[in-house]
Design a protein with these regions (language model features):
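Non-catalytic positions within long, well-ordered alpha-helices that form the structural scaffold/packing
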Residues: 27-28, 159, 184, 225
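Conserved beta-strand segments of alpha/beta enzyme cores
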Residues: 33, 68-70, 96, 165, ...
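S-adenosylmethionine
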Residues: 132, 171-273
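SAM-dependent Rossmann-like transferase core, predominantly class I methyltransferases
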Residues: 77-140
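Conserved beta-strand termini and adjacent loop/short-helix elements that scaffold enzyme active sites
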Residues: 72-74, 98-100, 114, 194-196, ...
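N-terminal auxiliary segments of SAM/dcSAM-dependent transferases
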Residues: 6-105
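Conserved SAM/SAH cofactor-binding pocket of Class I
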Residues: 121-201
């Protein structure tokens, strides 16, 4: 007997590029995920599939500050069908980011990411920049810190690149749980995921990954630098091109060894001298 179709709610927000960086984590708690589509160089569409629409819209208005949005109803047999239609394999440089239900065979080097649990599905320019910059750095045998790991995508790529040990941290519960799950399904054995704040960390690392927004970098850049070993490298993104000049004030004697730009965002490879 065919199952009766139920309705799924889709919420669409048109926003400026960069707004998605500041989505509160309550958004991820109330939605099956967020998908980002480019409308133009400066405009994006954020697509959500909330389980309880009224509660989600309250968070969208009161926490995220969006008051204009579209709500659509879609009849589906299975909620999972919506997710599978919305999340397809994505190529970034040499790597493919694919959802767990897609067969890895034929995709070469790939990262399995459960979509929507936390920021970091590979769709955003800052994640793409980080992955492309990471390819330019030697990871084999290195100890790596992924500060603000989100979905864990960068930690998993560090594992693929041959890192000896990776510590992935995030102070948000949903990101921590997402990274734990993604690390497990990728069997990234060298990656340890912890719910921690940057200020709680000690020790030094060969490579520090920091895909963070400018406000966090402004307040914590000295801490990030201290976590890198002498001659270690820091790979940064989450910086708007217009903010690069300000960032240069905080990097001190760090040497810039690589720069990549994409869609109004910039990323840097820095060496601690």
């Amino acid at each position: 007997m065919e199952r009766k179709k139920k309705k799924v709610f889709k919420v669409v927000v048109t926003a400026h590029k960069g707004d998605e960086e500041f989505l509160p984590y309550e958004i991820y708690d109330e939605s099956k995920g967020v998908w980002i589509e480019d409308e133009s160089h400066e405009v994006i569409r954020l697509i959500f599939y909330p389980e309880v629409p009224e509660r989600f819209l309250s968070v969208l208005r009161e926490k995220a500050g969006f008051t204009k949005y579209e709500v659509h109803e879609e009849p589906v047999k299975d909620y999972g069908d919506v997710i599978k239609r919305s999340f397809r394999p994505l190529r970034i440089g040499e790597i493919y980011v694919i959802p767990p239900w897609v067969e890895k065979k034929g995709y070469g080097k790939s990262i399995l990411i459960e979509p929507g649990m936390a920021f970091g599905t590979g769709r955003h320019e800052t994640t793409k920049i980080m992955i492309l910059l990471m390819k330019e750095v030697e990871f084999k045998g290195k100890e790596v810190l992924d500060a603000g790991c989100g979905s864990g995508i960068l930690s998993i790529y560090a594992y693929i690149l041959g890192a000896k040990k990776v510590l992935a941290i995030d102070n948000e519960e949903s990101a921590y749980l997402s990274a734990k799950k993604n690390v497990a399904i990728n069997r990234a054995s060298c990656v340890e995921v912890k719910k921690k704040d940057l200020r709680e960390l000690e020790g030094e690392y060969d490579i520090v990954l920091a895909n963070l927004d400018m406000n966090i970098l402004r307040n914590h850049m000295s801490q990030i630098v201290n976590l890198a070993k002498p001659d270690g490298k820091i790979i940064l993104s989450g910086i708007l091109s217009s903010e690069k000049r300000e960032l240069l004030k905080y990097i001190g004697n760090l040497r810039i060894e690589g720069v990549k730009r994409m869609g109004g965002w910039v990323g840097l490879i820095l060496r601690k001298t």
